[in-house]
């Protein structure tokens, strides 16, 4: 994968280690800080104590998280975009239950217009259609899934045009690359063992991933 040359690891002590593969000895550490006033307690409003994957809609006014207690994707509205301290839980009636597909939902992501939702759980990624964009309560399972090659699939991200899906493999310590011949359509997905990045030397049990805007850097949370 192109992004394999550039990786970043978020460490438990709150530092970010970025490694540029073009300069193998070049590693920088940057301290990550946050304001305690910007913390939002999911369990207090939704009863969910085992939060996993997170995602936003395209303008930051809605936030979603996958919860292992209810096996559901829950929806929150933010009065200030991307400010979680302004989040309001929309209630259990506005969630998407995924129990029939997985009992451990982890990573979640949307397609480019919010009409599709993807949920990683156990060894698969599952695809759902939303009749109203970014409204998970309108979601229905497409009866389409794809085996990721890892029995504990966590964070998932698409590239910018939806022709590649990347999966953090918690058990295998790999980042799997999945190719889609039709953008955002899991039924057209294929995977090769050669198209994976092992992060075992840097990040045991990777939980989530993110790219920079042009896909030249990959960041891994473990």
Positions of the model-derived regions?
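Extracellular glycosylation-rich, acidic/polar low-complexity regions of adhesion-
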Residues: 1-32
């Amino acid at each position: 994968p192109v992004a394999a040359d550039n990786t970043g690891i978020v460490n438990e002590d709150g530092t970010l280690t970025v490694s540029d593969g073009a300069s193998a000895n070049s590693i920088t550490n940057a301290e990550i800080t946050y304001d305690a006033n910007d913390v939002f307690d999911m369990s207090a409003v939704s009863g969910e104590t085992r939060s996993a994957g997170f995602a936003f809609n395209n303008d930051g006014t809605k936030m979603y998280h996958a919860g292992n207690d209810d096996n559901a994707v829950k929806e929150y509205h933010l009065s200030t975009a991307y400010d979680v301290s302004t989040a309001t839980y929309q209630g259990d009636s506005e969630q998407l239950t995924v129990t029939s597909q997985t009992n451990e939902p982890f990573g979640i992501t949307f397609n480019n217009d919010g009409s599709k939702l993807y949920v990683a759980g156990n060894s698969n990624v599952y695809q759902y259609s939303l009749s109203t964009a970014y409204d998970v309560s309108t979601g229905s399972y497409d009866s389409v899934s794809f085996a990721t090659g890892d029995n504990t699939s966590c964070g998932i991200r698409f590239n910018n045009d939806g022709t590649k899906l990347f999966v953090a493999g918690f058990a295998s310590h790999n980042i799997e690359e999945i190719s889609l011949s039709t953008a955002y359509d899991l039924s057209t997905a294929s995977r090769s063992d050669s198209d994976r990045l092992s992060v075992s030397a840097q990040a045991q049990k990777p939980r989530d991933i993110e790219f920079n805007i042009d896909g030249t850097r990959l960041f891994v949370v473990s």
